[in-house]
Amino acid sequence: RDRLRSRGLGDVYKRQVITFISKKEGLPDDHLFPIFKGIRFYNHGPHIHEYLQEFRRDVLENYDCMTIAEAPLVTPQRALDYIEESDTNEIDMMIQFQCMCADCFFTDYMPRSFSLKRLRRAFSSWQTQLDGRGWNALYLENHDHPRVISRYGSEQYRVESGKMLAVSYLFLKGTPFIYQGQEFGMTNWRPESTSMYEDVQTRNQHPDWPEEKRLALYHRASRDSARTPVQWTDGEHAGFTTGTPWFYVNENYKDINVEQALHDPDSILNFYKKAIALRKSLPVVRDGSYQEYYRGSDKLYVYARETKEQKLLVICSFTDKPVRFQAPYNFSLGDMKLLLTNYDGTREENSFLTRPYEARVYLYE
């Protein structure tokens, strides 16, 4: 890393499972957690802060750079031990996994029904507990998880839910990360056989199960869905290469690709561009407080961002069924400007029925 920096390379470092780099000595046995056997002996180990402080002192302090660390099973309070803003913080941002557990138990290969309440709790706990003390890393996709439209959205309403999911996290406080393919709505890959999967983590799951049952699980949970070649065009190999790609191309590339998205003004890609431009133009997104509404709902995620000068209201429906929305008591939508929505023909009423996977962003200033 130091050699890269000395050559002018590497303004941002991502450090994988950083909380695992210090282990308790003695190789003790553990039988508490069948999924993460032994994790209490190597997660947040005895020398973790010593190692990270050494790396900061000997490498990071010599350069103007940013560090992002991945940390499974970390809570907001534990994350602050690493990222709390100070002259000696060890990491700038931490990638947590709680927002990836809204439809599974700890790992994608132990699925359960999607729960918006679990997702909202993850978002809200990190927004509130890090406020004024640390900076959030915001994401919905990466190389270790299936495609988010197939998980938290709807392939039937791919465009609508893809846009809604963008809104759900792009207006939170923190730095958003967008994974390749997410910005134009790639979905899960569904091959015909389990033998087509290459990820070792996937292939090790339930080898004794019948093929049909394993295939259904892999279709839903495999991180290979995030590792198929990016779909640039509807041409051969999705325009990724004129040679032979290292891995299978998702068969839906004829309909879902960058070229198509660029020429469609209503595409997910162009929606992301609008949302990012708005985010950059609004100080309230960077500096505003966070307040969640509709906490009891399993269909709506509604939150506000507020400074003395601006108030932002974000409304996201996570269902294809109509849901009655009533503006919170301290908001009048008629007095606010509708900045962004994934539907045409929107009227500014304090009470309305949502359309499938509808999203709206309002501003008052």
Task: Please state what every model-predicted region is.
Residues 40-44, 148-160, 255-266:
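Active-site rim elements
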